[in-house]
């Protein structure tokens, strides 16, 4: 059973498999905001769950993530009225060239996008 006070669920990387499980098996989660951080969007199962059970999700992914596919991402965004934060040159761990300062700047960008998403209707 999912706590009724939960409004947002987040999955990161392999956690997006758990997120898809929640959405498939617990109908009450389908009204919650979902944040898919470095989702495994090359997985057809993940794509299917996002399309059928995730309303207006936020997807966060880097262009150097091996799971990044611009066509798949665009299809998901169109199918769900979702939003995305795509980080140029970021890998699956959100690491970017430029050392620690660049990484901190990426984390700030992501937190700002997540905050805006959480505050949105």
Where are these regions (language model features)?
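Primarily recognizes the serine-hydrolase "nucleophile elbow" in alpha/beta-hydrolase
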Residues: 1-55
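Conserved beta-strand scaffold positions in the cores of enzyme catalytic domains, especially
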Residues: 34, 84-86
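Cofactor-binding loop segments of dinucleotide-utilizing enzymes, especially the Rossmann-like FAD-
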Residues: 39, 62-63, 89
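Short beta-strand/loop motif that positions the catalytic acidic residue
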Residues: 53-54, 59-61, 65
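Acidic catalytic loop of the alpha/beta-hydrolase fold
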Residues: 63-68, 92-93
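Conserved loop-alpha-helix segment in the C-terminal half of the alpha/beta-hydrolase fold
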Residues: 69-82
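Catalytic histidine-centered segment of alpha/beta-hydrolase-like enzymes
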Residues: 90-106
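C-terminal alpha-helix
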Residues: 109, 113-121
């Amino acid at each position: 059973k999912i706590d009724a006070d939960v409004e947002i669920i987040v999955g990161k990387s392999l956690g997006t498999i758990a997120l898809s499980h929640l959405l498939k098996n617990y109908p009450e989660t389908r009204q919650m905001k979902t944040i898919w951080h470095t989702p495994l969007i090359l997985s057809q199962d993940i794509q299917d769950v996002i399309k059928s059970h995730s309303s207006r999700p936020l997807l966060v992914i880097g262009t150097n993530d091996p799971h990044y596919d611009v066509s798949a991402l665009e299809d998901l965004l169109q199918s769900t009225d979702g939003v995305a934060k795509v980080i140029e040159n970021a890998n699956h761990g959100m690491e970017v060239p430029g050392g620690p300062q660049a990484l901190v700047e990426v984390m700030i960008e992501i937190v700002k996008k997540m905050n805006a998403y959480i505050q949105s209707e």
